């Protein structure tokens, strides 16, 4: 999935928010955004996590996810953002169509394999 060119970011949507940032294929250390505060004193983990998705329903949660991704874009200026995790498939088609350019969706299995690869990269440093 990671092409190795430019800044590539991965976010996973599930019980919370997971992320990884790669520059030219190299994993950037200490790029943990899930514990950042987003709104009403909530972390991104809480704001986009499964509990909120169940509370809001897919329609409203999808809009929230899109707005968060739109907010990340000017901060990270990615060449490509990959969105995965168990809840990525729950983002509605309407909200997917409104996402910024250079956003791709990947199956949940891809995110799990990428997470294992990230641990391997961290362990070898």
PLM regions with names:
Residues 1-12, 21-125:
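ATP-binding/phosphotransfer module of carbohydrate and carboxylate kinases, centering on a glycine-rich
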């Amino acid at each position: 999935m990671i092409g190795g060119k430019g800044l590539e970011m991965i976010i996973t949507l599930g019980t919370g928010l997971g992320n990884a940032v790669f520059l030219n294929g190299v994993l950037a250390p200490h790029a943990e955004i899930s514990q950042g505060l987003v709104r009403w004193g909530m972390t991104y983990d809480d704001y986009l996590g499964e509990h909120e998705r169940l509370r809001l329903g897919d329609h409203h949660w999808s809009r929230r996810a899109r707005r968060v991704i739109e907010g990340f874009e000017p901060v990270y200026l990615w060449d490509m953002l990959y969105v995965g995790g168990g809840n990525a498939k729950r983002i509605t088609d309407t909200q997917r169509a409104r996402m910024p350019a250079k956003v791709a969706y990947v199956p949940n299995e891809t995110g799990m394999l990428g997470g294992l690869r990230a641990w391997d990269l961290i362990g070898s440093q």
